[in-house]
């Protein structure tokens, strides 16, 4: 009997874990249009009511692949519940690439679109921008946050945000409502 139990445990340990549904993948080069930096492969997967972002890195001149331990893994970076669209996009610029997490959602109370911008800066996955617009209970709203310049524009009104340390913009603990929790956007 112990032999069977041991065999079952061994078999269970060697089987792969249940795969999460892949929602979107994107790849690029953190150096942007020059293509002379580190490459990356980003994957957005379904994780219960949230979306998980996982990023693997590659060296200059070699493609990143989804093997081994990822450089970045945040299991709750974006909203998953009520999502009608979830995708990753890469915006290449002369100053580097921005990885965008795009979520569109709809429920009985409203609709909206959230875009979170990430860059790899000084060995940190950094949130550099956040945009949330939509309608809630018949009332429209919009919040656009430029974390490079610490400026938030809410419903057409611009305000200067208090400076924060570099670590405060680390994407590893960013969640779908972090911009509200940290005071970058306000709830009306």
Residue ranges of each PLM-predicted region?
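Beta-propeller blade repeat segments, especially FG-GAP/WD-type strand-to-loop junctions
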Residues: 51-69, 117-122
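Short, surface-exposed coil-to-beta transition loops
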Residues: 38, 50-52, 110-115
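Acidic/hydrophobic-patterned starts of short beta strands in beta-sheet-rich repeat architectures
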Residues: 31-45, 54, 92-105
């Amino acid at each position: 009997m112990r032999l069977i139990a041991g065999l079952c445990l061994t078999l269970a340990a060697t089987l792969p874990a249940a795969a999460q549904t892949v929602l979107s993948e994107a790849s690029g080069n953190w150096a942007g249009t020059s293509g002379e930096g580190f490459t990356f492969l980003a994957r957005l997967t379904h994780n219960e009511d949230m979306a998980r972002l996982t990023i693997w890195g590659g060296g200059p001149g070699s493609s990143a692949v989804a093997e081994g331990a990822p450089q970045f893994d945040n299991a709750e970076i974006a909203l998953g519940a009520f999502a009608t669209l979830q995708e990753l996009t890469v915006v290449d610029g002369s100053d580097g690439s921005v990885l965008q997490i795009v979520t569109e959602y709809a429920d009985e109370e409203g609709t909206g679109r959230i875009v979170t911008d990430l860059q790899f800066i000084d060995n940190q996955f950094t949130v550099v921008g956040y945009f949330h617009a939509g309608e809630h209970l018949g009332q429209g709203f919009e919040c656009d946050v430029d974390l490079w310049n610490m400026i938030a524009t809410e419903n057409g009104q611009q305000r200067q945000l208090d400076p924060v340390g570099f670590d405060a913009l680390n994407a590893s603990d960013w969640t779908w409502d972090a911009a509200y929790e940290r005071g970058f956007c306000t709830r009306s």
